[in-house]
Amino acid sequence: MSMIEEKIYKGTTTVGLVCKDGVVMATEKRATMGNFIASKAAKKIYQIADRMAMTTAGSVGDAQFLARIIKIEANLYEIRRERKPTVRAIATLTSNLLNSYRYFPYLVQLLIGGIDSEGKSIYSIDPIGGAIEEKDIVATGSGSLTAYGVLEDRFTPEIGVDEAVELAVRAIYSAMKRDSASGDGIDVVKITEDEFYQYSPEEVEQILAKFRK
């Protein structure tokens, strides 16, 4: 396994779901340095536009820098073109940025998702700029195998955002139980045509109480 892969696939679980009425994205909060838990409140999900979010796996410093740059670029796009950017446009911009640094890559794997004039979508982007549109579910990071097991068992194309939020929380929670590099709470957002909503820790706890053993 390369140094880049080790940096990316240790210390994070993120998931994204494309639902019939929106997009749901979730992460856990643990940041690690080898076997050391460096933070129990790491931010791994960012609002980068009105109805758009980005999740990050990998280097915290690289992720924070990219989140700032992409948010600025999204604002500039809207000012220059006098219309809101699409998810595809921001994913392409991010892909081009990462590819331009492919010989000295940012140690991140990203999910960018939301709702725009073209509909709802999520893109996964690798450290050297490869971008793939995910049609239904996606998981990244060290706990992704466990998360995929939960998502694939319960996801349907007709799932709504509220049910998908519970599924995303369940998937992250399952990964946290099996992956020592994931843990310490869950952040989850739902994005619909009407709102960008981030659930509070208390609301997440209420969801967890439904299936926690």
UniProtKB/Swiss-Prot annotation:
**What UniProt keywords apply to this chain's record, in alphabetical order?**
Autocatalytic cleavage, Cytoplasm, Hydrolase, Protease, Proteasome, Threonine protease, Zymogen
Q: Which Pfam families match?
A: Proteasome
Q: Which residues form the active site?
A: T12
Q: Where in or outside the cell is it found?
A: Cytoplasm
> Propeptide residues, per UniProt?
1-11
Q: Note the subunit structure.
A: The 20S proteasome core is composed of 14 alpha and 14 beta subunits that assemble into four stacked heptameric rings, resulting in a barrel-shaped structure. The two inner rings, each composed of seven catalytic beta subunits, are sandwiched by two outer rings, each composed of seven alpha subunits. The catalytic chamber with the active sites is on the inside of the barrel. Has probably a gated structure, the ends of the cylinder being occluded by the N-termini of the alpha-subunits. Is likely capped at one or both ends by the proteasome regulatory ATPase, PAN.
- This chain belongs to which protein, by name? Proteasome subunit beta
